[in-house]
Amino acid sequence: MGSGYQLLQLPRERFRKTSFLVWVIILFQRAISMPLGIVTNSTLKATEIDQLVCRDKLSSTSQLKSVGLNLEGNGIATDVPSATKRWGFRSGVPPKVVSYEAGEWAENCYNLEIKKSDGSECLPLPPDGVRGFPRCRYVHKVQGTGPCPGDLAFHKNGAFFLYDRLASTVIYRGTTFAEGVVAFLILSEPKKHFWKATPAHEPVNTTDDSTSYYMTLTLSYEMSNFGGNESNTLFKVDNHTYVQLDRPHTPQFLVQLNETLRRNNRLSNSTGRLTWTLDPKIEPDVGEWAFWETKKNFSQQLHGENLHFQILSTHTNNSSDQSPAGTVQGKISYHPPANNSELVPTDSPPVVSVLTAGRTEEMSTQGLTNGETITGFTANPMTTTIAPSPTMTSEVDNNVPSEQPNNTASIEDSPPSASNETIYHSEMDPIQGSNNSAQSPQTKTTPAPTTSPMTQDPQETANSSKPGTSPGSAAGPSQPGLTINTVSKVADSLSPTRKQKRSVRQNTANKCNPDLYYWTAVDEGAAVGLAWIPYFGPAAEGIYIEGVMHNQNGLICGLRQLANETTQALQLFLRATTELRTYSLLNRKAIDFLLQRWGGTCRILGPSCCIEPHDWTKNITDEINQIKHDFIDNPLPDHGDDLNLWTGWRQWIPAGIGIIGVIIAIIALLCICKILC
């Protein structure tokens, strides 16, 4: 009996041990999640209490960042003549500086060095710690003179001048800046790599590296009467060749124009000054603001082969040899091709493919290093693969005095053919002065290329100079032709990667940038969510009498047109919810600051202080992407096709898998209980 009793008691002992272990686990779990009453150390900070009480819940505002947003995202004119009209001088207004944590990548930045008529400087030097804006695609460097009627240069529309994580109300001399405002956005947490130390002067300007994907290109200008009602702006091709800018234009136009002048050998000689003017028929608004990508509408693209260079007049100067030999004025006219419809593919209406001889991003910056201006281009012998178009002609005034540079060129017309042809540009000799013999004309054989002029480095030039080889083919499959996608993708606009290709809407009348790329002191990434707070700028304090706060309407251009008309209602709903979430975080941050003396909000309220305003941005964004994917990218499914994996009898596969999983879990639980008991 005794042995039988012990055998009967053995399972009960095991059960007691198992029960004891379970109770220990339960008590240990409750001890970890004990209410705030056990925290008696009054020296704890609010953030530490939040970590004890709220743990994984959203209780901090670390994701709320002050971001410098560029005004160019709203589609404002970025050319130098238009931009300088937004700046003015004032006296008696002290400058103000505001710091921000993250900045947006800028397409156009500016760098000014202006002097008065007496030689004194118009702009002050930057204070200690103020560095230039580090993320610029084009830097417009302006040198010139002006009356400068005031002490400091402010923004007439009440915006900031954005520098490296500092936004100032004034322009500093020789320091690169971008126009913008400061707003609050909910940004993703930066990626922290334990093996990578943070440099002392972050963000590192990646444009210093010539191999970087983002590479800065400097455009030089000369301006007179800066700050006055009527200013004169000249685009500087080299030290003696300029182009008169009399209407708005894009930086892509200036890059193409520079290369066209150099390839056609239309530069001034070493002692003369040549100023070109643009014919009214030329459209300088080629290309569209597409953020780091030179996306051009083919019908608006500038074709250097259709440009006509004509010398208008020559004014000689009978001074010493050290002075300029003469000032030459020329006119650039444009005869557009008759029809380019044969170059547009008909199989894919939403996509227009344009082949260019080189990489998409680096077509205008090949062979350049950071800090090198557009005037540093050289006329190297090169080969360009072109598509057929109407034959080109060149008109040059024959009544040109001998003092002017000999820029004539004879061209042999050849009929267009169905296949691509290759042009061999002979090396251009330096232009001779007025006392030297005339330069012999060079001969070109071309059917009028349709690709834009571009600059290549010597290595690519050597590879492309082989007969039958085009630069585009030499670049390999990793360097495809330029493609314009007219369907905007919401996925790209909400969570893009750093080097991801962009898409542009077909009807971008205001040239609005639909994406938001930002840089921080630690990492770069994409903005998470659409939460934003109305920006603040210096004009909010009423210190300006010129201009109005018109930047407020469409601050981010309707949040940069993140979706098309079919998802507009969903976008507005998302914006409203994220705004409420942002304001809640701001209020919580203010309350934490006020109650920090008594230990913080959680010390007073206990666990009820844990707020968790969920961010459903990704879910709503996925729905938007799914809508666009269903109705644009994919055709409607055929419900009659029983071969679909999730139709017919196959629709029971997920249910069967779930049932089998439940059965396996029950069997495993029974086995565990059998072993323990």
Swiss-Prot record:
Keyword Cytoplasm: no
A GO cellular component annotation in the UniProt record: extracellular region
Signal peptide: 1-33
Classification via SUPFAM superfamilies: Virus ectodomain
Keywords associated with the record: Clathrin-mediated endocytosis of virus by host, Cleavage on pair of basic residues, Coiled coil, Disulfide bond, Fusion of virus membrane with host endosomal membrane, Fusion of virus membrane with host membrane, Glycoprotein, Host cell membrane, Host membrane, Host-virus interaction, Inhibition of host innate immune response by virus, Inhibition of host tetherin by virus, Lipoprotein, Membrane, Palmitate, Secreted, Signal, Transmembrane, Transmembrane helix, Viral attachment to host cell, Viral attachment to host entry receptor, Viral envelope protein, Viral immunoevasion, Viral penetration into host cytoplasm, Virion, Virus endocytosis by host, Virus entry into host cell
Disulphide linkage map: C54-C610, C109-C136, C122-C148, C512-C557, C602-C609
Annotated region described as Receptor-binding, given as residue ranges: 55-202
Site (Cleavage): R502, S503, D638, H639
Post-translational events: The signal peptide region modulates GP's high mannose glycosylation, thereby determining the efficiency of the interactions with DC-SIGN(R). N-glycosylated.
Entry protein name: Envelope glycoprotein
